[in-house]
A protein has these predicted regions:
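N-terminal Rossmann-like NAD(P)+-binding subdomain of aldehyde/semialdehyde dehydrogenases
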Residues: 2-108, 136
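ALDH superfamily catalytic-core signature
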Residues: 5-6, 13, 131, 209-339
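Conserved C-terminal structural/oligomerization subdomain of aldehyde/semialdehyde dehydrogenase
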Residues: 34, 322-458
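Glycine/threonine-rich beta-strand-loop-alpha-helix active-site module
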Residues: 90, 159, 530-645
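Rossmann-like NAD(P) dinucleotide-binding subdomain of oxidoreductase/dehydrogenase enzymes
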Residues: 98-239
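Carboxylate- and glycine-rich phosphate/diphosphate-binding segment that chelates Mg2+/Mn2+
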Residues: 270, 278, 612-723
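ATP/NTP phosphate-donor binding region
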Residues: 460-546, 818
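Gly/Pro-rich interdomain helix-loop hinge
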Residues: 738, 744-829
Length: 871
């Protein structure tokens, strides 16, 4: 043992030193490659393919003579495949520099080589695999260093040399193709584990492939194949037998994709067997099967005896002491099961074939699955059938990356001859076979693709109801609205008491054709999920084709919820309330509304803007009185009627509160990260109208002022429906859900503090492509200037706007703080962190001009509760 360790110690430095020499040369080649363009590379690869093709017979002969395995004529075909088919499949591949430049979608793809590649080649396909790997490496500007199988060193090196000389002659760097001259495990391991080897292309025995994968770097390897071939009763039997024999005898079965077991359905078993025998297959008897097992399989490993790999059937029979007719192509053994108790069910890489008889197609599929699971996971499987249903069942069950239908497996597996698979001599087996790829390996696996992405802005939108009617008595539209026969009015008790429901019914009764009318008047402030459910039940009975939401925000929100559940009863409320970053990309898609009923919104307050928005706020009173803003453009009404007749008699407090809600909508829309040219004008006009008319509207009830505020509400609604809101509403939603204060009043108390917070430089910036940089403070100052407030600097403008809002609140009789409303500070402090956390969760937070921290939201709550201002 000491002598062995000493010898190993001496060998290690030599292996490392030798490997480093190869690596240093490869590095120089790698640098030189970077100066070549696509045209130069393509000329080099073509020259390599031509050189390999020119010597394909010479190399085939060398391979057979050196390895003592395979069939000369088939080696010729393999070498032609490795040159002609491989070159044809990669010649148009872009592998150098810019491979895609998409000006429309603003990205660019740049291909770069992965780096120095180590190529491991097998004894079974030595020259063809060398040609294949060298060509795809040079196509991608990667130097490659080969570690050839010792039993095929000379022929493999000759193949590499022929391609290298052709490559250099046509402009490739020296040493772009190298190989270990005197192979040893030390040198192979040193090369595999060298830190400058970027990738290993491993084709060989499972031990070698596993070693490659254990090197801690990307490896593209091939798992073993134990390929079942199921011949189902509807198959073309002549073709199936032809394909089976063609494939299994190709290079004496040394293609890893070759069939290892044939599974035949009982009704056709005798016919298939007869055809196989007629074409040179020899079915061994029980005694001969025992001899074949002993000679072909190493018992303790249940693995093929290397002696028989790639040998002709007659020679294998002779080695096993079995007499067979001259010209025997395949030795076939009928066996009963799969696994270690049935050694011939393993991969054999020779013209030795296991055979099974099955009663049904289902049994055939299950037997094929067993064969794959016994050492062939991920590789290939074959079915011969003309029954599409059976083919699909087979495909669904097989854990293989290549499922070949009605074709020879050897030729089908390597691709492009019998199918559209990429031509390759390295066949990935995916995670089934512990491989990193499930595809046929080719040039595209050997490049790093860098994606250069230019900044893009999201497509935005402007969505409002199809029809908006305004001016006094515009409710008269209902008398002529087309295509309605059954109308359900959703409202609250006060609308009935004030006679507003009667006004709506009056116009409906003026229609030439009478309509059926039903009223749901039980909507409470902050409508609950229970109310929505009750209204939905009424709709289900009445079956309206038109829903009229009459009232303030609560009836409209409730009606929208009822509309949704009426048309789609199975909709999940839990999914509806989920947040989104981009409304077009939300995980849960709202169903398309309007299939059963049109939706008409008639606001009787001047605040929510719900008549033109895609929002509805529903309160889940069974789970903490949480307000959930539902948002989707499907919730946008079909018709909005902005009739000031409904707001002339509103009480002062309601006008004040809802008016400040309008102002909050407009200001938040103007500073939103999604604010745009289409919403800015609406927002500014709404702000101007509020400052010009709200005080007069609330304190005197002037009709013109009421009308202007009614219009301002809708203008602000259209603005925030498309630019969205911010934390003012997030905070108000959660506060209102807990303490049940009027929504507009809550917004009004919060607004000065939110503006002051939003105008400060962010702790965290908001993410929205069009929002180039933080400008909320400047936008607030712009509002101040438009209103004629002092704003010589941005800071002065922000302060002026805050002062103007506080002054307006005082004039309207709105308290400065939440504490003035009578709430207990201790109770507030016990809840504030929870409320801040829920406010962050609110959908409105996503469009705020800066991303708030939860702790910052809690401080805004405290400022509004205690009235703290930094003057």
């Amino acid at each position: 043992m000491a002598v062995k360790n000493e010898a190993a110690a001496k060998a290690q430095p030599d292996a490392q030193e030798y490997t480093q020499t190869l690596i240093d040369k490869a590095k120089k080649a790698s640098e030189a490659f970077m100066g070549l363009d696509q045209e130069q590379i393509d000329k080099i690869v073509q020259a390599m393919a031509l050189a390999g093709l020119d010597k394909h017979m010479y190399l085939a002969k060398m391979a057979v003579e050196e390895t003592g395995r395979g069939v000369y004529e088939d080696k010729i075909i393999k070498n032609m495949f490795a040159t002609e088919y491989i070159h044809n499949s990669i010649k148009y591949n872009k592998t150098v520099g810019i491979i895609e430049d998409n000006a429309y979608e603003s990205f660019q793809k740049i291909a770069e080589p992965v780096g120095i590649i180590m190529g491991i080649t097998p004894v079974t396909n030595p020259t063809s695999t060398t040609i294949f790997k060298a060509m795809i490496a040079i196509k991608t500007r990667n130097p490659i260093i080969f570690g050839f199988h010792p039993s095929a060193q000379r022929c493999s090196a000759e193949a590499a040399k022929i391609l290298l000389e052709a490559a250099i002659k046509h402009g490739a760097p020296a040493d772009c193709i190298q190989w270990i001259e005197n192979p040893s495990m030390d040198r192979t391991n040193a090369l595999m584990n060298h830190p400058d080897v970027a990738c290993i292309l491993a084709t060989g025995g499972s031990a070698m492939v596993k070693a490659a994968y254990s090197c801690g770097k990307p490896a593209l390897g091939v798992g073993p194949g134990n390929v079942p071939c199921f011949i189902e009763k509807t198959a073309d039997l002549d073709q199936a037998v032809n394909d089976l024999i063609l494939s299994k005898t190709f290079d004496n079965g040394m293609i890893c994709a070759s069939e290892q077991a044939v599974i035949i359905e009982e009704p056709i078993f005798d016919q298939v067997k007869k055809k196989m025998i007629a074409n040179g297959c020899y079915f061994v008897n029980k005694e001969e099967a025992a001899k074949l097992t002993a000679g072909a399989i190493i018992a303790d490993k249940c693995a093929v005896n290397p002696t028989i790999v790639g040998q002709p059937a007659t020679k294998i029979a002779e080695l096993c002491g079995i007499e067979v007719p001259a010209g025997t192509k395949i030795l076939v053994a009928e066996i009963e099961g799969v696994g270690t108790k049935f050694p011939l069910s393993a991969e054999k890489l020779s013209p030795v074939l296991a055979c099974y008889k099955v009663k049904t197609a289902e049994q055939g599929i299950e037997r094929a699955l067993e064969v794959v699971q016994f050492g062939g996971m991920g590789h290939s499987s074959v079915i011969h059938s003309n029954n599409d249903e059976i083919i699909q069942k087979f495909s669904d069950r097989m854990p293989t990356c290549r499922i070949l239908v009605n074709q020879p497996s050897s030729q089908g597996g390597i691709g492009d001859i019998y199918n559209t698979n990429l031509p390759s001599l390295t066949l990935g087996c995916g995670s089934y076979g512990r491989n990193s790829t499930s595809s046929n390996v080719t040039a595209v696996n050997l490049i790093n693709v860098k994606r250069v992405n230019r900044r893009t802005v999201n497509m935005q939108w402007f969505k409002i109801p199809d029809k908006i009617y305004f001016e006094r008595n515009s409710t008269q539209y209902l008398a002529k609205m087309p295509d309605i026969t059954r109308v359900l009015i959703v409202t609250d008790p006060m609308m009935v008491k004030l006679g507003y429901v009667e006004r709506v019914e009056h116009y409906l009764r003026q229609r030439q054709t009478p309509v059926a009318i039903e009223v749901f008047a039980d909507v409470e402030p902050d409508p609950s999920t229970t109310t929505v459910q009750r209204g939905t039940e009424l709709m289900a009975k009445f079956q309206p084709d038109c829903i009229i939401a009459l009232g303030g925000g609560s009836p409209m929100d409730a009606a929208k919820g009822m509309w949704l559940f009426y048309e789609y009863p199975d909709t999940d409320f839990h999914n509806l309330k989920q947040k989104f970053m981009d409304i077009r990309k939300r995980i849960y898609k709202y169903p398309r509304l309007g299939q059963k009923a049109k939706f008409v919104a008639i606001p009787t307050t001047s605040g929510t803007g719900s008549e033109v928005t895609s929002f509805a706020v529903i309160t889940d009173k069974e789970n903490g009185n949480t307000k959930y803003p539902l948002a989707d453009y499907e919730l946008t009404p079909d018709v909005a009627i902005i009739d000031p007749e409904f707001v002339y008699s509103l009480p002062k407090v309601a006008v004040a509160d809802t008016g400040m809600d309008v102002l909050t909508h407009a200001i938040e829309a103007y500073v939103s990260v999604m604010a745009n040219d289409f919403t800015d004008g609406l927002a500014i006009k709404a702000i101007q109208l509020v400052f010009q008319y709200l005080e007069q509207s609330a304190l005197t009830g002037d009709k013109l002022a009421r009308e202007k505020m009614h219009n301002a509400s809708t203008l602000a609604g259209m603005a925030f429906a498309n630019a969205f809101l911010g934390i003012n509403h997030s905070l108000a939603h959660k506060w209102g859900g807990q303490y049940h204060t009027a929504h507009g009043r809550t917004n009004a108390i919060l607004m000065p503090h939110v503006i002051r917070y939003n105008a400060k430089k962010p702790t965290k910036f908001a993410a929205w492509p069009k929002y180039r940089s933080f400008v909320a403070d400047e936008r607030y100052a712009e509002i101040a200037r438009i209103l004629g407030l002092p704003a010589r600097t941005t800071e002065e403008g922000v302060k002026s706007l805050i002062k103007a809002i506080r002054d307006l609140n005082r004039k309207l009789g709105i308290p400065e703080t939440f504490q003035e409303l009578g709430f207990d500070p201790k109770d507030f402090e016990s809840r504030v962190d929870y409320l801040a956390d829920r406010a962050f969760e609110d959908q409105c937070t996503t469009a705020n001009p800066k991303l708030p921290l939860v702790t910052e939201l809690a401080e805004v709550y405290r400022d509004a509760f205690y009235g703290r201002f930094d003057e």
